[in-house]
Amino acid sequence: IANRHTHLLQVVGVIIALFFQSCAAHYATNMVNTPMLKQQGDLQIGGSVGHLGLNGQLAYAVSDNVGVMVNGKQHEAWYADDLATSNTVMFVEAGAGYYKWLSEHTIVELYGGYGLGEVNLVHAQKNTDITYILSRPFLQPSIGVQADFFSLNFATRFTHAGLRSDSIQLSGLFIEPAITTKLQFEQLSAIYQMGIVRTLHTDTPEMQVLPFWLAFGFQYNFDFTKND
């Protein structure tokens, strides 16, 4: 099983490398934040690493049914190939939404928000250095189940990503389903997430899309109501 997992990571790594070596503008999403907040005052802070780079996530329960979130991403890669390619991505988004526990073990969530970022693509041999501004609103419904120390969440994020430089303007509508599992040990949780990106509509077919992602990380849960 370990060999299969290693082989999968190698294949994914090759696909990612080929993706970022392309001269075309591209859209690489960030990790989906699936907080599954319990009640007013809950605060979560987490981070992950994976094929999307470094991701940071924060979520806070404003009330027993309203939550807010802030997410960030940083990715930097350099490839010593014939093109001498480098790629740097910085992205931050904020959102708010509604959550409701249907039972002791089942929750539904709906979050929406907006993000801004910057994508810098350099091909040294081709003397190309392009910076794109990334803008992206999102809408994210999800359903989750909680059993003791284990939780499973299925989210479907809809995004409209726009990439704009001095001479290029690209955009597309995407669907980004993701499955997130969390193993909780007291207030610390280990997170694993995998997801895919599919294009719903684009007027600019030259806009490339990173088709899937894997991410691993940890999340710390602050419960300020525990001692009330």
Annotated model-derived regions:
Residues 1-23:
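Sec-dependent bacterial lipoprotein signal peptides
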Residues 30-32, 100, 115-228:
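Outer-membrane beta-barrel transmembrane domain signature
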Residues 37-45, 54, 64-66, 104-110, ...:
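Outer-envelope beta-barrel architecture signal
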Residues 49-61, 92-101, 139-141, 177-182:
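Generic detector of contiguous secondary-structure segments
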